[in-house]
């Protein structure tokens, strides 16, 4: 029984866990993708590995793309200023 627990734990630690998050997608300067229509955001989000996306009107960062289930490797908007437009 103990061996089964140890093997299971070892396998769990060896396999990488890919998580996803819902967030505003951002470029390398911490600026959101400005939008007007949902198809644009859906396309940009899917291009970056998300399940879907839509244009969040009048949101925290104005009209910006919000992605659902975005991979960890893709940059998202973090607190702080947008460094250039």
Curated annotation (Swiss-Prot):
Q: Which GO terms describe its cellular component?
A: extracellular region
The tissues in which it is expressed are: Expressed by the venom gland.
Give the signal peptide as a residue range, or say none if absent.
Answer: 1-19
Q: Which SMART domains match?
A: Knot1
Q: Which GO terms describe its molecular function?
A: sodium channel inhibitor activity; toxin activity
| Pfam families associated with the record | Toxin_3
This protein's source sits in the domain of life called Eukaryota
Q: Does the keyword Endoplasmic reticulum apply?
A: no
* Cell compartment(s), UniProt: Secreted
Alphabetically ordered keywords of this record: Amidation, Antibiotic, Antimicrobial, Disulfide bond, Ion channel impairing toxin, Neurotoxin, Secreted, Signal, Toxin, Voltage-gated sodium channel impairing toxin
Q: Does the keyword Secreted apply?
A: yes
State where it is primarily located. secreted
Gene Ontology biological-process annotations: defense response to bacterium
All copies of the LCN-type CS-alpha/beta domain together span 21-83
Q: Which residues carry this modification: Arginine amide?
A: 83
User: Which cysteine-cysteine pairs are annotated as disulfide bonds in the entry?
Assistant: 31-82, 35-55, 41-65, 45-67
Q: Give the comment on domains.
A: Has the structural arrangement of an alpha-helix connected to antiparallel beta-sheets by disulfide bonds (CS-alpha/beta).
Task performed by this protein: Alpha toxins bind voltage-independently at site-3 of sodium channels (Nav) and inhibit the inactivation of the activated channels, thereby blocking neuronal transmission. This toxin inhibits inactivation of Nav1.4/SCN4A (EC(50)=2.23 uM) and drosophila DmNav1 (EC(50)=220 nM). The toxin (1 uM) does not significantly shift the midpoint of activation at the two channels, but induces a significant depolarizing shift in the V(1/2) of inactivation of the channels. In addition, the toxin accelerates the recovery from fast inactivation in Nav1.4/SCN4A and DmNav1. It also shows antimicrobial activity.
Query: Which family is it part of?
Result: Belongs to the long (4 C-C) scorpion toxin superfamily. Sodium channel inhibitor family. Alpha subfamily.
Which additional comment does the entry carry? Negative results: shows no effect on Nav1.2/SCN2A, Nav1.3/SCN3A, Nav1.5/SCN5A, Nav1.6/SCN8A, Nav1.7/SCN9A and Nav1.8/SCN10A.
Annotated protein name in UniProt: Sodium channel neurotoxin MeuNaTxalpha-2
Q: What is the lineage of its organism?
A: Eukaryota, Metazoa, Ecdysozoa, Arthropoda, Chelicerata
